[in-house]
Amino acid sequence: MLTKREKKELGIGKDQGKAILRYARISPRKVRIVLDLIKGKDIDEAYAILRYTPKAASSILFKLLKSAEANATNNNGLNRDNLYVAEAYADQGPTLKRILPRARGSADRIRKRTSHITLVVKERS
């Protein structure tokens, strides 16, 4: 496993823009539905899909895609017109546990799930 410094010296990751959102208060299952729509698409097409998809994850992913694009163009000097969504995945974060009171003094547990979302954009060659 390489450290951040070693990766920088070797130039690893200079061909991509990456954005990670951690602890997003949305279930990873719901995020994956929208992620599957934009995987492998050109960046402009991905923006259009996210803008017109009526899901809660769409607005979160729109901002994340914007950040990944900015990282690719500003930090790594990639051409915006050739960018596409190379990788997109959502992993499960820690689950917040809450209690819902029920009849006769019992209680149910509510699981409020969180996700770690990663978007990677690369240049098409």
Curated annotation (Swiss-Prot):
Keyword flag Cytoplasm: no
GO biological process: translation
GO molecular function, one term: structural constituent of ribosome
Domain of life: Bacteria
The UniProt record lists the keyword Oxidoreductase: no
GO CC list: cytosolic large ribosomal subunit
Matches recorded under Pfam families: Ribosomal_L22
UniProt entry keywords in alphabetical sequence: Ribonucleoprotein, Ribosomal protein, RNA-binding, rRNA-binding
PANTHER family assigned: CHLOROPLAST 50S RIBOSOMAL PROTEIN L22-RELATED (PTHR13501), LARGE RIBOSOMAL SUBUNIT PROTEIN UL22M (PTHR13501:SF8)
Assembly and binders: Part of the 50S ribosomal subunit.
Entry's family note: Belongs to the universal ribosomal protein uL22 family.
Role noted for this protein: This protein binds specifically to 23S rRNA; its binding is stimulated by other ribosomal proteins, e.g. L4, L17, and L20. It is important during the early stages of 50S assembly. It makes multiple contacts with different domains of the 23S rRNA in the assembled 50S subunit and ribosome.
Name recorded for this polypeptide: Large ribosomal subunit protein uL22
Organism the protein comes from: Acetivibrio thermocellus (strain ATCC 27405 / DSM 1237 / JCM 9322 / NBRC 103400 / NCIMB 10682 / NRRL B-4536 / VPI 7372) (Clostridium thermocellum)
Lineage: Bacteria, Bacillati, Bacillota, Clostridia, Eubacteriales
Record gene name: rplV
